Amino acid sequence: MDSGDGYNTYSYEEGAGDAKKEVLYKIGIIMLCIVGIVVLWVLIILCCAVPRYAKSTMDAWLSSSSIMKRKMASRITGTPFEETGPHRERRWAERRTEATNQNNNDNVNRFS
């Protein structure tokens, strides 16, 4: 009898190897899905945590000392630190009236 003919050519181990590969592929796909879900979950948590952190930081900054606010304002705007003090707020009313007077003078000059 020829060894290549009949049922003797198929062994159980060959089929078992294919089944093992199939199971390993399924386990790999399941693991990839789990890792993807975990990564998405972490990203969602970070997206929620960053605004919460920013809000608490801004609340703490707003309740902090005015010197710290002045330093930050001078750094952001490029204004010298001495010009960011409370005298600036006190002069706001004067500057506002000066601007209003200037506008009124322009209107008077335009009509005369």
UniProtKB/Swiss-Prot annotation:
Residues 84-98 have a biased composition (Basic and acidic residues). Residues 77-112 are annotated as: Disordered. The chain crosses the membrane at residues 27-47. Residues 101-112 have a biased composition (Polar residues). The keyword RNA-binding does not apply. GO terms for cellular component: host cell plasma membrane; membrane. It is a single-pass membrane protein. GO terms for biological process: transport of virus in host, cell to cell. It is found in: Host cell membrane. Keywords: Host cell membrane, Host membrane, Membrane, Transmembrane, Transmembrane helix, Transport, Viral movement protein. Belongs to the nanovirus movement protein family. May transport viral genome to neighboring plant cells directly through plasmosdesmata, without any budding. The movement protein allows efficient cell to cell propagation, by bypassing the host cell wall barrier. This is Putative movement protein. It comes from Subterranean clover stunt virus (strain F).
